């Protein structure tokens, strides 16, 4: 496995400069950055997520707790939006469950075990003690269509949506 240190030695620059060039930082001379990226490509360099996580104290992993079928039309669209936004921001998505392989663990423990930077709770049994434990944890939590004290909530205004639908259908002459 090729390391930043090896690339820095070949290019005659510091490891920090290689890291900045690979991450698109603007304070590296463009010609130097391109040379570093070319050497990295030629050597088959692939970033190491574990090393990045140790350095940044972030996993770039967002957990999603979702209890319904993924083919649920509304939530499938929400999940697709979450995935696309996460990818745009350099994050991966992981589904939070109550086990890893054959090992049973709480939603909180699974999220902590995978070192999630945060968790989105949606379409869950909100009164479930494991969901309550996760919502009350130190992890950053966003909850869809439910309110937990201390968590950010994103709510859908179903009443306003229904009024809009009725007006639309009535306006179509139905």
Segments and roles (model prediction):
Residues 57, 172-174:
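Short, flexible coil/linker segments at domain boundaries that flank nucleotide/cofactor-interacting
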Residues 2, 61-167, 171:
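Alpha-helical recognition/docking segments in bacterial nutrient-uptake
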């Amino acid at each position: 496995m090729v390391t930043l240190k090896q690339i820095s030695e070949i290019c005659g620059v510091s490891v920090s400069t290689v890291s900045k060039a690979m991450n698109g930082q603007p304070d590296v001379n463009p010609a130097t950055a391109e040379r570093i990226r070319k050497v990295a490509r030629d050597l088959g360099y692939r970033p190491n997520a574990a090393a990045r996580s140790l350095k940044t104290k972030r996993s770039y992993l967002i957990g999603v707790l979702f209890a319904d079928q993924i083919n649920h039309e509304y939530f499938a669209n929400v999940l697709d939006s979450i995935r696309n936004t996460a990818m745009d921001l350099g994050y991966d998505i992981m589904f939070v469950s109550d086990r890893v392989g054959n090992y049973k663990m709480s939603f909180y423990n699974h999220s902590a075990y995978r070192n999630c930077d945060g968790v989105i709770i949606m379409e869950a049994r909100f009164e479930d003690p494991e969901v309550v434990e996760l919502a009350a944890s130190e992890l950053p939590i966003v909850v869809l269509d439910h309110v937990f004290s201390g968590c950010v909530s994103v709510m859908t205004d179903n009443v306003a949506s229904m009024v809009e639908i009725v007006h639309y259908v009535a306006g179509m002459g139905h």
